[in-house]
């Protein structure tokens, strides 16, 4: 399973990239707004840091507007992937963009049939949201398993990006469920690095080494 970082914060992206574990970035209007900077300016800087898929989202809710925005975003860099919301107008836009060779990531997926429709419309990626399903008492991992099974049975090449990932357990379960990618907040990536026994082991090694050199 590949790992993307889910942020628009340049420092977080730089730090995550230095770890050598990420191969893509996802952003959304909320994450961009937090940075208080121009959308294109932020995206251009991200593309200079990470050599991999960079998702930028449209804000229009009608097909014509989505397609227009998508074409402009796609011009920023060859690695751009256009995030399109799951809705009828979004599917129309995805189909048009697919025919033009523009990659898309259909977001806000909450059911396997939504993912199937997005894939058949020509989506390069689908993004099921785990945490938000957990919030309403559903099991996000069942959704990942269902999408993965459907895509495998029917030979669908659309990749699954598990989104709304909130903790290391989510990441573990995504990998086991067959997700192609997990897009993870920077703070969760840092949580994944740590384990109490690892920290204790490092501390013991250092103490033993110091004892040898006294």
Curated annotation (Swiss-Prot):
Its EC number is 2.2.1.2. The keyword Transferase applies. The keyword Nucleotide-binding does not apply. One of its GO terms (molecular function) is transaldolase activity. Keywords: Cytoplasm, Pentose shunt, Schiff base, Transferase. It is found in: Cytoplasm. It catalyses: D-sedoheptulose 7-phosphate + D-glyceraldehyde 3-phosphate = D-erythrose 4-phosphate + beta-D-fructose 6-phosphate. GO terms for biological process: carbohydrate metabolic process; pentose-phosphate shunt. PROSITE patterns: TRANSALDOLASE_1. Gene3D superfamilies: Aldolase class I. Pathway: Carbohydrate degradation; pentose phosphate pathway; D-glyceraldehyde 3-phosphate and beta-D-fructose 6-phosphate from D-ribose 5-phosphate and D-xylulose 5-phosphate (non-oxidative stage): step 2/3. The active site is at 83 (schiff-base intermediate with substrate). HAMAP family: Transaldolase_3b (MF_00494). Belongs to the transaldolase family. Type 3B subfamily. Transaldolase is important for the balance of metabolites in the pentose-phosphate pathway. PANTHER family: TRANSALDOLASE. This is Probable transaldolase. It comes from Clostridium botulinum (strain Eklund 17B / Type B).
């Amino acid at each position: 399973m590949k790992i993307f970082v889910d942020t628009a914060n340049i420092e977080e992206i730089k730090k995550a990239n230095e770890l050598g574990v990420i191969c893509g970035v996802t952003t959304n209007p909320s994450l961009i707004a937090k940075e208080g900077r121009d959308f294109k300016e932020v995206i251009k800087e991200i593309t200079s840091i990470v050599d991999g898929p960079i998702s930028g989202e449209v804000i229009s809710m009608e097909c014509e507007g989505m397609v227009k925005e998508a074409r402009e975003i796609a011009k920023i860099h060859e690695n751009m992937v256009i995030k399109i919301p799951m809705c009828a107008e979004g599917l129309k836009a995805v189909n048009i963009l697919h025919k033009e060779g523009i990659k898309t990531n259909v977001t806000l997926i909450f059911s396997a049939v939504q993912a199937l429709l997005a894939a058949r419309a020509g989506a390069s990626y689908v993004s099921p949201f785990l945490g938000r399903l957990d919030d309403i008492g559903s099991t996000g991992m069942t959704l990942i398993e269902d999408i993965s099974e459907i895509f495998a049975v029917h030979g669908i090449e659309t990749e699954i990006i598990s989104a709304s990932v909130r903790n290391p357990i989510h990441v573990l379960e995504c990998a086991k469920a067959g997700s192609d990618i997990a897009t993870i907040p920077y703070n969760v990536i840092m949580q994944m690095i740590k384990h109490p026994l690892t920290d204790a082991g490092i501390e013991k090694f250092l103490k033993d080494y110091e004892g040898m050199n006294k």
